UniProtKB/Swiss-Prot annotation:
Protein name according to UniProt: Small ribosomal subunit protein uS2
Region spans: Disordered: 236-262
Keywords attached to this entry: Ribonucleoprotein, Ribosomal protein
Gene: rpsB
Single GO term (MF): structural constituent of ribosome
UniProt keyword annotation of rRNA-binding present: no
SUPFAM superfamilies associated with the record: Ribosomal protein S2
Keyword Ribonucleoprotein assigned: yes
PANTHER family: 30S RIBOSOMAL PROTEIN S2 PROKARYOTIC AND ORGANELLAR (PTHR12534), SMALL RIBOSOMAL SUBUNIT PROTEIN US2M (PTHR12534:SF0)
Family: Belongs to the universal ribosomal protein uS2 family.
Organism: Psychrobacter sp. (strain PRwf-1)
One Gene Ontology term, aspect cellular component: cytosolic small ribosomal subunit
Annotated GO biological process: translation
Signal sequence residues: none
Length: 262
């Protein structure tokens, strides 16, 4: 795998099976420009398009992370949910891995009330409040907390609307994409040959079902974000050190003046 966080090698995509699309009879004509051909009635994706699109998307999220912006990872189907949660947590980004609740973006103010309730219940569980309740009351609150955690746990620390969303399987996550577009939030999407690329700002033509391929996509996206955050830290450190160097020069320049004054 390439060391560059904003470069997706074609070899990695080939090995992961990213070029295998869906059966030809299920294709979406809007994806025609990204299709190389067909083999055994399976569409083959032109990975030259995939590499170019992926590198553009990686560069974009890398830049967002360098500005301390947030990218919401979205993948609720079985092939994606596990790695979405794992890599989003590794990159310190919000995620939705269970089910997209209508209004997660467009009704954020109302949703924030549920998030506050979740945090309140978590605090009660930690500070011993649950232990003071009857078994039935404690069980009810525990179940309520677990339900909220499953639905909202990945976005409870998002703090506001994300600056972009990254989606695995754009058809499966159509509601999330629609909400993002309504709010002008850029969408990065893995788009298979059977999917509709409309409303996706960064179209990455690739297989969206193979677990190995999905793991590759999400991991590389997280890598690019982590690299962007590290770059921001380096820049912040350099900026903090610069005044200190100037102070030293000022002190050195002032020393002869003090001597001449004597």
């Amino acid at each position: 795998m390439s060391n560059s966080p904003t470069n997706m090698p074609m070899r990695d995509l080939l090995q992961a099976g990213a070029h295998f699309g869906h059966q030809t009879r299920f294709w979406n004509p809007k994806m025609n420009q990204y299709i190389f051909g067909a083999r055994n009635k399976i569409h083959i994706i032109n990975l030259e398009h995939t590499v170019k699109a992926f590198n553009e998307a990686l560069t974009y999220v890398n830049g967002l992370a360098a500005k301390n912006n947030k990218v919401l990872f979205v993948g609720t189907k079985r092939a994606a949910s596990g790695v979405i949660r794992e890599q989003a947590l590794r990159a310190g980004q919000p995620y939705v891995d269970h089910r997209w609740l209508g209004g997660m973006l467009t009704n954020w103010k109302t949703l924030r009330q549920s998030i506050n309730r979740l945090k309140e219940l978590e605090k009660q569980a930690e500070d011993g409040t649950f232990a003071k309740l009857t078994k039935r009351e404690a069980l009810e609150r525990t179940r309520a907390m677990e339900k909220l955690e499953r639905s909202l746990g990945g976005i409870k620390n998002m703090g506001g609307l994300p600056d972009a969303i990254f989606v695995v399987d754009v058809d499966h996550e159509a509601i999330a994409i629609k909400e993002a577009k309504n709010l002008g939030i850029p969408v990065i999407g893995i788009v298979d040959t059977n999917s509709n690329p409309d409303n996706v700002d960064y179209i990455i033509p690739a297989n969206d079902d193979a677990i190995r391929a999905v793991t590759l996509y999400v991991t590389r996206m997280a890598d690019a974000i982590i690299a962007g955050k590290e770059y921001a830290k380096t820049q912040a450190g350099g900026a903090a050190e610069a005044p200190a160097a100037e102070d030293v020069q000022t002190e050195e320049a002032a020393a002869p003046e003090a001597d001449s004054a004597e």
